[in-house]
Amino acid sequence: MKIMKNFLQYVALLSAVALIAGLTACSSGSNPPSASSDNSVSTGITIESADATSDASLEEEPLKTAVTPNTSEATQGQSVGKNTTTKTKTSAYTLDTVQEKKFASLKGTTIHITTSGKQPSDGQKKVMTTMQNKYGVKFETQILGWEESQTKMGQMVAAGNPPDIGSFSEVLALRYIYANIAQPIDDYIVRDDEYAKQMRLEVYTINDKLYGVPAGYFQEYYLYYNKTLFKEYGLKDPYTEYYLKDNWNYNTFLALCKSATKYEADGKTLKFAGVGTWNYAVFMMANGGTGICPDGKGGFEVVIDKPAEMAGLQLLYDLVEANALYTGDSYTGFRQRKNAMLIERPAHAIGQFDYYNRMDDEIGMVPLPKGPNVSQYHVPITCDGYFVPRNANNPLGGAAFIYESAKQNLIEEHTTEPAALKKRRENISDEHLAIRDEYLKSAVPVYTHMEGLAGWWSGERDKMWNQIVVDKKKPAEVVDSIKGILKSALKRTIG
């Protein structure tokens, strides 16, 4: 079965999960029309309380816009549609840190944000309340759906009237950055701030400039396994028998996947496969591979044929050859015992489907195995992010909203506040959180911008992975055919 089914599941999944969504370079291509949305509606509101987060989305079409002068004075107070504003509240906070003092000058200003629904998400409301009380700001909200925002953000930037905050995913970030839709925010974010140091700012740092802040919590991929099923079939527990004994690598992982692949009495009909995932790139990333990487000259280069990447592709090929890779819907398959293990992020693997409660079987969690080309564990991550659009009227306000949103996510990872604690436990249990926290003390985060190349997500990506998963071609053959395609996509993206 082609992996597009997994992709569609992923898109539906992202749009339903409640997560807070959410580099100067040359621009190429024609400029988009200098027009804003005629159908968007803005409304100002005063927020009193909130307790959750917003959704995220994916978009693939290339977006280009010319660099235009900052029009903060010319467009002050302008927006799309009907506008009202919030009331400024008296601050009960003391601004003690360097970062907070940098935001102190925001008092009395208005921050323009967009919402995908008629009202801001609960997560946005919580951040808005904090900022109203802390910095004395006002908010202007504009209804702008995720898909609509991705097609119109470039237009609004070119017209000089974008919102102060935008969101992108790994599928969009690189193109937004090189199209000059996102602007550097180094002047607004203090990198050595206590919370900023935990925000993985390197993800959206390109050419030593910060263009965005990762959003959402629990961004890492883990291996979930059906502990009940493992016990029934006498399989070794990967956490206690491999990871804790420092014997968790690509060889032991492959052997476990093979032994966790079982057949019916006829010896031919598959009962369940060892592992399933939609994101085959994690096999490269757990070995430090990223497919493309900075070239040290302001651009990127294709490294899909380097040892770290090739070892990841080989592991995928070996799983396919052993019939140990489940290629159906691995989320449903995990619940229905069709794949004994699932590789995903906590909110997507567990929280989205309420599997801690819906599955009768006990669920185990273990970090991904250590790759053969690295000396320590590498943890694959993917995350959406917030950015400040070029020509935003209040870039400092946008950066403040981004910072406070990411800070709120970090706080909620270990909060004891009842509502947020309940939500966290729906995504990751206390037991699994303890495993995660200990693991992250030494694991190296790995992320890739390969997914953000023009034309990659919408078609070329599936062609690459299907050559291994469906056609069962060896990695060397696949790389020979795909390297040129990656180079072309890279050129279209960054020039």
Where in this protein do the model-derived segments appear?
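Extracytoplasmic "Venus flytrap"/periplasmic binding protein-like
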Residues: 129-197, 210, 232-233, 238, ...
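Extracytoplasmic/periplasmic solute-binding protein
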Residues: 206-221, 231, 246-301
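Glycine-centered hinge/linker elements that transmit conformational signals in sensory
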Residues: 254-257, 294-328
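Conserved C-terminal helix/tail region of periplasmic/extracytoplasmic solute-binding proteins
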Residues: 51-92, 390, 395, 409-495
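C-terminal motif of bacterial Sec signal peptides marking the signal peptidase cleavage site
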Residues: 22-25
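Extracytoplasmic/periplasmic substrate-recognition and gating elements
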Residues: 355-419
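A structural signal for short loop-to-beta-strand junctions that line the ligand-binding cleft
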Residues: 102, 154-156, 163-164, 193-230, ...
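Hinge/lid segment of periplasmic solute-binding proteins
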Residues: 77-107, 169-222, 251, 366
